[in-house]
Amino acid sequence: MPIRVPDELPAVSFLRNENVFVMTSSRAKTQEIRPLKVLVLNLMPKKIETENQFLRLLSNSPLQIDIQLLRIDSRESKNTPAEHLNNFYCDFEDIQEQNFDGLIVTGAPLGLVDFCDVAYWPQIERIIAWAKDHVTSTLFVCWAVQAALNILYGIPKMTRETKLSGIYQHQTDKPLALLTRGFDETFLAPHSRYADFPVELLQQYTDLDILVSSEEAGAYLFASKDKRVAFVTGHPEYDVDTLAGEYQRDLAAGLNPQIPLNYFPNDDASLPPKASWRSHGHLLFANWLNYYVYQITPFDLRHMNPTLD
């Protein structure tokens, strides 16, 4: 889907250099169709980098997507210019009366922080509750999965002893599900987290459909039967060098990290890694947009679909 973004957003030139179709707001006004409204709650510190990653995955389809970037942390950012945040992000109070076709909640580097110590935890609770009445389908990614499972299902925070980092093999458990349509029987996907998502824990606490899992990484992709919420515990949006950057960052911080699994050639961090997960990342987001958002959402967002009640 050509994503519809402000003309001045840095992602426009960045993604066009990759031959990704980006439609600016000025051009979109000439097309007489209703774009899908997708809200992106960006919790990552390097917001511009994260914008580029998610907008790339949202861009590959003929329908328009009107992207609205959302922030909830009022503290001064160390990694993103204030001017960028002020120009391209809205506060929750600006949109709380609106309805959206989709909501994406990104990960956050909070794997070792208790929920009660997360500065914006009350805002997370508020937005997840708000989404039940104002969003057709919500996609949670990595840390946001752990937060949502706690808020929606009462699942306690599960933390691994060592960080799960690298490229892991996954098996498609339900190949006929809409969200996994077109998936290979096995495929690779990146993980970078302390959070633990055992399949047995999800089966104990929820009736969520577990669609993809990994012997090493646990549950990867699961969703509610009504398609209102979907969860991906890895990072299909990651650039080829994102894990390398995280590894070097942790080395510099003296954390003695393990080298990301199945990532650097011959486990040699001096060699450039190669991406092996992009196609399934694109397919996952395309399926979510099509089957969980576009096929269900009402044409007039002022009247949310009664099946969502």
Swiss-Prot record:
Active-site residues, record numbering mapped to chain: C142 (acyl-thioester intermediate), H235 (proton acceptor), E237
Entry-linked InterPro entries: Class_I_gatase-like, HST_MetA, MetA_family
Binding site for substrate: K163, S192, R249
Site residues (Important for substrate specificity), renumbered to this chain: S192
Site residues by UniProt (Important for acyl-CoA specificity): G111
Main location: cytoplasm
CDD domains linked to this entry: GATase1_HTS
Membrane-spanning parts: none
GO terms for cellular component: cytoplasm
Family matches, as Gene3D superfamilies: 3.40.50.880
Enzyme class: transferase
Molecular functions (GO terms): homoserine O-acetyltransferase activity; homoserine O-succinyltransferase activity
Record has Transferase as a keyword: yes
UniProtKB keywords: Acyltransferase, Amino-acid biosynthesis, Cytoplasm, Methionine biosynthesis, Transferase
Pathway: Amino-acid biosynthesis; L-methionine biosynthesis via de novo pathway; O-succinyl-L-homoserine from L-homoserine: step 1/1
Function: Transfers a succinyl group from succinyl-CoA to L-homoserine, forming succinyl-L-homoserine.
Family the UniProt entry places it in: Belongs to the MetA family.
Listed name of the protein: Homoserine O-succinyltransferase
Organism of provenance: Yersinia enterocolitica serotype O:8 / biotype 1B (strain NCTC 13174 / 8081)
Gene field: metAS
